[in-house]
Amino acid sequence: EIMPSLVGSEMCIRDSQITFDVRQPKTHEYTMKRLRKFIEDHPYVNVLRFTTFFHQFTLVFDELAREKYVDWYGYSASVSPYILKQFEEEVGYPFRAEYIIDQGYYNNQYRVPSKEFQDFQAFQRREVAKIVKEMTEITHECGKKAMMFLGDHWIGTEPFMEEFKTLGIDAVVGSVGNGSTLRLISDIEGVKYTEGRLLPYFFPDVFNENGDPVKEAKYNWVTARRAILRKPIDRIGYGGYLKLALQFPEFLDYVEQVCNEFRTLYANVKGTTPYCVKKVAVLNCWGKMRAWGCHMVHHPLYQKQNYSYAGIIESLSGAPFDVVFINFQDILDNPAILDDIDVIINVGDADTAHTGGEWWETPKIIEAIRGFVYNGGGIIGCLLYTSPS
């Protein structure tokens, strides 16, 4: 089945949903031929929107089809024997299942990442980038533009890492659930434009006789709007089944209002530098790899255990600060990185990736941050110790 998006002549291909490893030679060859055939069969399409590339984020269900574990940044589903063999040949040491299982925590973003896991992530980003570039080159060769959907099978294409610059992507579109998820899209550099897919999706769970799509649309727009004033996306859109939306004329009226507001905001903000009171650095073990995604477990969905931490990042998304994301290794490599920072924010449960754990036992780190504070810098930290149970 071919599903057009709501904007322009962008289309995506969705055959029966089966999982295959595009990294292997035969499936790789098949995928490239399939891409060329799709372009040839649809000459009227001018933008191909790839619903990302190759590897789904970690999502585990139990035998009753209940969602039991999710990590929107998780690499656990990107493992295969073929990939692991390549990894071992490159890094020179054998891969162990524990590098992924991680004592049952599956390397969620709260775990201080091991060297081996970071090696695996870097390897995946490099290999994913090679094939993405091949696909975008085919797209451009055929006179089309390539757009990436930020989500779903997006592991290895993190937009703030060096590998992303090599992908050849023309544009990025992603779902907008709040200010943080908007900045996750709008802060991307090196693309011609960015687009936010606003909520709600035109699906039966909201568009039914008991649903209130206007209420959900208002909440979504007001939540995301403040971040647009700091760093705007270039376009907005919605997604789903148009026939459902047509049954709610008051919703269509509100969408028209949202579009008009967006045009006004964009006309005033695009190309300008908003006023910044200070420069803030969010410090954790991930740095720019998790920029605007700190404490983000399942995109913008509320999580009881971390909503206070996620709320800090959400607040920053629309606050008058120049926000950067750094990790401890950045400071270790270059302590001068702190010279133009006014405030460091380091918040999370104790001994997690968001506070640093054993990184605070590194003398050079302690020296750099103490010197930063001595010279007038500020640091905001929040360490919560949780019981083993």
Give a label for each model feature.
Residues E1, S9-E40, E216-A217:
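N-terminal accessory beta-strand-rich subdomains and adjacent acidic, glycine-rich linkers
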Residues L301-S387:
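Helical hinge/lid and interdomain linker segments adjacent to catalytic or ligand-binding clefts
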Residues R36, N46-T52, T58-V60, Y110-R111, ...:
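Hydrophobic targeting/anchoring helices
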